[in-house]
Amino acid sequence: MLFRSGWMHDFLEYMKLDPYFRKHNHNKMTFGITYSTSENFILVLSHDEVVHLKCSMINKMPGEYEDKFANLKAGYTFMLGHPGKKLLFMGQDFGQLHEWDEKTALDWYLADEPLHGDLQNYVRGLLTLYKKYPALYRQDNDWDGFQWINANDADRSIFSFIRRDETKKKNLLFICNFTPIPRDDYRVGVPKRGNFTLLLDNEHGLYEKGDGPAVYKSSKGECDGQPYSFSYPLPAYGTAIFRF
């Protein structure tokens, strides 16, 4: 397996940008898909990127303190959906503030702080979905496992795509908004009529049994080059993963 350092560089360069200028660098997030099946890749955010004054992962993010966490949630969601195995370095799940130092322990107390604890729970939700849905790993090296819905919405810095496994019975739809601008009636194209069950979003995290996850019904109406579509209230830095 091969660490995908080129992807990591492009991903971090994009994530560090002021959201209002990300539209000029949209290709940094889409280029990696063009060669994602050529090797057995690991998408890694390594220790090399959180030392030597490069800043911790949370402090690479732009904006005010709360914005940093929202940005990182969006980034991690995109990373989860991107083909390739995943590797986060220690402390990146709860927003370690200091750079990595091999001589000291992580600042574990931060996990008890609201924003840090919320980020950790969100990452836990992402990993729960990763374990539960083979669509997120079984076809990393097969073009049938990934489909862009809209890779070209640079002006709004929104990405949407589908992950599939061999059965094509438990597909996942991802939507990621990388700006602080909410899209209250965001319409996304989909390939079929039916129910799209919301599994996770950036405001609630993972919807588990008893949470009453929302179900969106697609209807006939072309969008994003697809024959069906539905509308979803996409928040600032909004992320959403649907099962269909």
Describe the function of each predicted region:
Residues 1-2:
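Short, small-residue-biased leader/transition segments that mark boundaries at the very start
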Residues 5-13:
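Active-site donor-binding segments of glycosyltransferases and PAPS-dependent sulfotransferases
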Residues 17-48, 75-76:
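Glycoside hydrolase catalytic-domain groove-lining segments
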Residues 20-24, 48, 53-57, 63-88, ...:
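Carbohydrate-interacting/catalytic domains
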